[in-house]
Regions:
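Class II aminoacyl-tRNA synthetase-like tRNA-binding/catalytic domains
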Residues: 2-170
Length: 170
């Protein structure tokens, strides 16, 4: 698995990491009795660090029915920190209300929130279905400046002079 460390808990040496990826939350467990070196490394994981993990799936002793993967956990065989992260300015969850300025300033974090992930995945699925339909029905996709929308980021439009209508642009 690869993802962000959403929550890290140290319960007397037993380390729990809630790994968040595009599919949701999966609990990882580092047990010092099984692998003390691995448990020691897991202590250094902080919120929003990017991590990879491999291990054995087992049934949880205390299921968490609030999440789809709440019946299982991954007992770590190995893991690593791909990238350390600074403490984010807000918690990456849907429960936190953010004003628009904060959301736009930290757009890269806002897009990690489950609600935003769901919107992106739904939009992606819509585009895939639409493209597939048009391709299967022999439509030709064209992208011209005339048909493309302007970007909201403030980039200038690319003007294309018309050969047919002198002094006019697309």
């Amino acid at each position: 698995l690869n993802g962000w460390a959403s929550v890290v808990r140290d319960l007397g040496g037993l380390i729990f990491i809630d790994l968040r990826d595009r599919w949701g939350i999966t609990q990882l467990v580092a047990e010092p009795e099984i692998n003390p070196e691995l448990a020691e490394r897991a202590k250094h994981v902080k919120t929003e660090d990017v991590v990879w993990a491999s291990g054995q799936v087992r049934k949880r002793e205390n299921p968490n029915m609030r999440i789809p993967t709440g019946l299982i956990e991954i007992v770590l065989d190995d893991f690593g920190i791909i990238n350390k992260a600074a403490l984010p300015p807000f918690e990456i969850c849907d429960d936190v209300e953010l004003n628009e300025d904060t959301r736009l300033k930290y757009r890269f974090l806002d897009l990690r929130r489950p609600k935003m992930q769901k919107i992106l995945l739904t939009r992606n699925k819509f585009y895939q279905i639409t493209h597939r339909y048009f391709a299967e029905n022999d439509f030709v996709e064209i992208e011209t400046p005339f048909l493309m929308k302007s970007t909201p980021e403030g980039a200038r439009d690319f003007l294309v002079p018309s050969r047919t209508y002198k002094g006019k642009f697309y």
